[in-house]
């Protein structure tokens, strides 16, 4: 007898066993006045970028019957020039690889350097896609805790002991860290690099919001170990463009070429990103505005009595509301006031993206009301 389609659930499918019971990644998508939960840049692309993209799309429209540049050479050249200018470290296109968001970059790296019988290490709480990508590539994911009493910094001595014990093939260091916002000093990254038996991926998705020097400066010293992952989703007002990249020794680009899908980066994606990079100086002016707003929000939250981790990113991680309720209850109270923030699963802490000044005012008003109730 044929199965009834409406009675089939995920449990009925021959899913890989290690994926059973898992939840798909994703922040709540709700229609509220102030959406401060996904760490997007709230400023739209400039008219110059919008017009430039429109012109390039019109030019390329007649060529869409052809596959894109398989290796995205022009885009990689533009990214190399940007990274060189932004970090002060000379980078060539042969050292840069681009893909559909940094998630695809990280997935390709795990496909090449992780996999069955191999492990990846992360310092948690951190970017929640790292363990999901590890699971998808059948890479064991092991963790070392970042503790609140240590302001969520990496305890390097504990990290080195864990590396010595577990011998991970891949180590993730997110700096500035998501969701906590703090940075890991280069000296600490270097100690981990020296101890690492495999590769170290430094995830710098929020680097433009920080004054800390980039790990790109360590590439020459650790050519067989270090990969620096970045994105255009945050500082570049380009989350919808889905463009991520990494910087490393050219041998790493050869490695991911073994696992990448053919023609993985669309012609229009490459063109739009190139236009955005042409206007990087103007675009990054929004970063200065967001950093100023971030510092204002942090100062006000502390005035109100909240505990706030020093942020080098475009969001704040705050606690100190136990007398009001747990994380879920406080998250709901913000939502009731038309402010959507993020409960990342760290008990007693919540994360809020820095938005436009009026959005931040709404967030701070809700935060003040909570302390007054």
UniProtKB/Swiss-Prot annotation:
Its EC number is 2.6.1.9. Pathway: Amino-acid biosynthesis; L-histidine biosynthesis; L-histidine from 5-phospho-alpha-D-ribose 1-diphosphate: step 7/9. It catalyses: L-histidinol phosphate + 2-oxoglutarate = 3-(imidazol-4-yl)-2-oxopropyl phosphate + L-glutamate. GO terms for molecular function: histidinol-phosphate transaminase activity; pyridoxal phosphate binding. It comes from the Bacteria. Signal peptide: none annotated. GO terms for biological process: L-histidine biosynthetic process. InterPro entries: Aminotransferase_I/II_large, HisP_aminotrans, PyrdxlP-dep_Trfase, PyrdxlP-dep_Trfase_major, PyrdxlP-dep_Trfase_small. The modification N6-(pyridoxal phosphate)lysine is found at residue 234. This is Histidinol-phosphate aminotransferase.
